[in-house]
């Protein structure tokens, strides 16, 4: 950029930064090429056109714009190409785009994207119209022609070319498929070779330009557009057309070269004070401006050589990662408007373009090789002498156990595999295994070469460690036996304490009949744990209030030769049950949330539900009415009553 005028003449230079890439990839540097296209004046009949134009072209590479700080000065910009308002679509395509297409046939990536404010003509540059086709139809037509010409060349007799297309839009930070709209946000991923891809996106094979038209025209109608004060058909999303060219070899080693062409029509930055956006238009504008701001941050980070490039801060920059500082031949067509009302939008676009042309990419060919795996040849088994052969193998096996390890290693070393017939992954694993075995063999050799005195010391130390382990195991068994005996004594003492307690026969009745010892499985009998204590039970008995009554005695027929094992079921006294229900009912009708939560199995949610039901339907008539509440069954009410009555007795 150069400032010119009667008072000042100054030149400003921009810093350069080479993008970082994997060191093993040998590539040539390719700077991002920037072209600027000036849109024609919208109203040709405007008499004030001469005074309202703020941009003027100087030659085929430079232009000047009025300095807003000083109207007597102009700022000059120089780019790779400048196209005035009279330039045709063909001139722009032939001058800036067509030269990058041959790179696709050798497995390299390329990208062309249109940048600029809203209403500056980006979509017209990329799409055009039937009379003046834009960059996209011209590039696809030439690419199809180039692939047919290359396929018919004698040196490419064993090669085939296939071309696929995908078409997506980035609308409000969502990647949407335009070929088959699914209203689904597609993810953006990066493979092990640092290639950006979109899993699940629709791909269509195209063999002719008619196939391309058949898929592209309906998909373009699916793109989101709307009307604003500055543009009747304003793009509300970033559109990305991906053309993938694959060159495949039909003979060994089956090489495959893959080149990708990104044709990107960016949505324009918008000043909502001038566009009058409201509602959904305002939300769309915010998403567009945010992604373009992230794009400017990426360019600044590349120029300043920052360690972190914010590609992942936006779906747009993530998708453009190959185009800016990556591995693609990139061309940016900056569209600007000449009107004075677009002055600051034009100035911002020119500054962004000046920074972008300093970015340097490192393109390289994407090549893969497929290895044919031949089936392993099996030796036919001899029918005669089979028994003798097996005996011979057994004898050789016994002999090998008596021989030294070195002899076995020598025998294994004589058997060699034909690595050329194996899968590369298998070969790699075999080489790693061979390396491990070699290292282990060296360690064994070192052990055998150890002096006799040191070897005897090592063996003695090993025997001592084994004896120590055995001693620790015996000690552990003794400790376990003592622990089991202590537990048995404790259980016996607890049972004797329970038998000596003053619990009367009328209060608790337990089966006291003798039992024959047997290995048959007997029914479990309820017992009181020691930690519950005897004081509470004894105090209850001393008051003369029996808590449980014997309900019914049942006998169960056991295995033959055994006595019948009696079992008991306990039934709670009716007066205690009724008094407990009255206490619970009173608390249900008068208690607060905190008081209700003191009941067993009543939490915050159920307590609020009880109070709400009480306010609508009045007090509960009985506790069983809890089953009328939503989410509480009659079975839950029964267990709730038992739990609270037992809790009151225990307390």
From Swiss-Prot:
One of its GO terms (biological process) is microtubule-based movement. Residues 31-359 form the Kinesin motor domain. GO terms for cellular component: cytoplasm; kinesin complex; microtubule; nucleus. SMART domains: KISc. Ubiquitinated, leading to its subsequent proteasomal degradation. Residues 366-413 are annotated as: Disordered. It is found in: Nucleus; Cytoplasm, Cytoskeleton. ATP binds at residues 116-123. InterPro entries: Kinesin-like_fam (IPR027640), Kinesin_motor_CS (IPR019821), Kinesin_motor_dom (IPR001752), Kinesin_motor_dom_sf (IPR036961), P-loop_NTPase (IPR027417), RuvA_2-like (IPR010994). Residues 452-498 form a coiled coil. Kinesin family member that is involved in spindle formation and the movements of chromosomes during mitosis and meiosis. Binds to microtubules and to DNA. This is Kinesin-like protein KIF22-A. The gene is kif22-a.
């Amino acid at each position: 950029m150069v400032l010119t005028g009667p008072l000042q003449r100054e030149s400003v230079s921009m810093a350069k930064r080479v993008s970082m890439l994997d060191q093993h990839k040998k590539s040539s540097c390719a700077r991002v090429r920037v072209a600027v296209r000036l849109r024609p004046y919208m109203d040709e009949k405007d008499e004030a056109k001469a005074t309202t134009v703020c941009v003027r072209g100087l030659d085929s590479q430079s232009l000047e714009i009025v300095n807003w700080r000083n109207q007597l000065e102009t700022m000059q910009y120089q780019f790779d190409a400048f196209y005035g308002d009279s330039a045709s679509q063909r001139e722009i395509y032939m001058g800036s785009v067509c030269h990058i297409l041959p790179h696709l046939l050798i497995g390299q990536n390329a990208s062309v994207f249109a940048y600029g404010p809203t209403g500056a003509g980006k979509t017209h540059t990329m799409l055009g119209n039937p009379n003046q086709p834009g960059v996209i139809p011209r590039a696809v037509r030439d690419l199809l022609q180039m692939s047919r010409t290359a396929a018919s060349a004698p040196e490419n007799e064993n090669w085939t070319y296939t071309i696929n297309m995908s078409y997506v839009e980035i609308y409000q930070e969502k990647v949407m498929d335009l070929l088959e709209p699914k209203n689904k946000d597609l993810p953006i991923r990066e493979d092990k070779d640092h290639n950006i891809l979109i899993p699940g996106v629709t791909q269509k094979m195209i063999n002719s330009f008619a196939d391309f038209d058949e898929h592209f025209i309906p998909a373009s109608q699916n793109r989101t557009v709307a009307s604003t004060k500055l543009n009747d058909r304003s793009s509300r999303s970033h559109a990305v057309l991906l053309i993938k060219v694959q060159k495949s070899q039909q003979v060994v080693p089956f090489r495959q070269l893959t080149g990708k062409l990104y044709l990107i029509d960016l949505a324009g930055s918008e000043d909502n004070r001038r566009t009058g956006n409201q509602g959904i238009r305002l939300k769309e504008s915010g998403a567009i401006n945010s992604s373009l701001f992230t794009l400017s941050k990426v360019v600044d980070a590349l120029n300043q050589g920052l360690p972190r490039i914010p590609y992942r801060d936006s779906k747009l920059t993530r998708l453009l990662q190959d185009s800016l500082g990556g591995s693609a031949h990139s061309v940016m067509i900056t569209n600007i408007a000449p009107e004075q009302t677009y002055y600051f939008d034009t100035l911002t676009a020119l500054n962004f373009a000046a920074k972008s042309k300093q970015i340097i990419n490192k393109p390289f060919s994407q090549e893969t090789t497929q290895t044919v795996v031949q089936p392993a040849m099996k030796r036919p088994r001899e029918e005669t002498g089979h028994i003798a052969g097996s005996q011979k193998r057994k004898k050789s096996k016994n002999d090998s156990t008596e021989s030294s390890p070195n002899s076995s290693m020598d025998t294994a070393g004589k058997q060699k595999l034909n690595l050329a017939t194996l899968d590369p992954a298998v070969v790699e694993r075999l080489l790693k295994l061979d390396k491990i075995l070699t290292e282990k063999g060296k360690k064994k050799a070192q052990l055998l070469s150890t002096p006799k005195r040191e070897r005897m010391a090592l063996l003695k130390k090993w025997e001592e460690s084994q004896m120590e382990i055995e001693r620790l195991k015996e000690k552990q068994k003794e400790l376990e036996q003592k622990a089991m005996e202590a537990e048995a004594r404790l259980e016996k003492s607890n049972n004797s304490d329970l038998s000596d307690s003053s619990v009367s026969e009328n209060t608790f009745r337990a089966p006291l009949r003798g039992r024959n010892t047997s290995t048959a499985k007997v029914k479990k009998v309820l017992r009181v744990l020691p930690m519950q204590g005897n004081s509470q039970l004894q105090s209850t008995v001393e008051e003369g209030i029996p808590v449980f009554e014997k309900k019914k005695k049942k006998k169960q027929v056991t295995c033959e030769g055994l006595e019948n094992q009696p079992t008991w079921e306990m039934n709670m006294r009716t007066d205690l049950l009724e008094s407990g229900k009255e206490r619970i009912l009173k608390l249900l009708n008068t208690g607060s949330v905190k008081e209700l939560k003191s009941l067993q199995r009543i939490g915050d949610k159920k307590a609020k539900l009880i109070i709400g039901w009480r306010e609508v339907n009045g007090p509960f008539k009985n506790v069983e009415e809890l089953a009328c509440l939503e989410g509480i069954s009659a079975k839950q009410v029964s267990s709730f009553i038992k739990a609270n009555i037992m809790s009151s007795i225990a307390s």
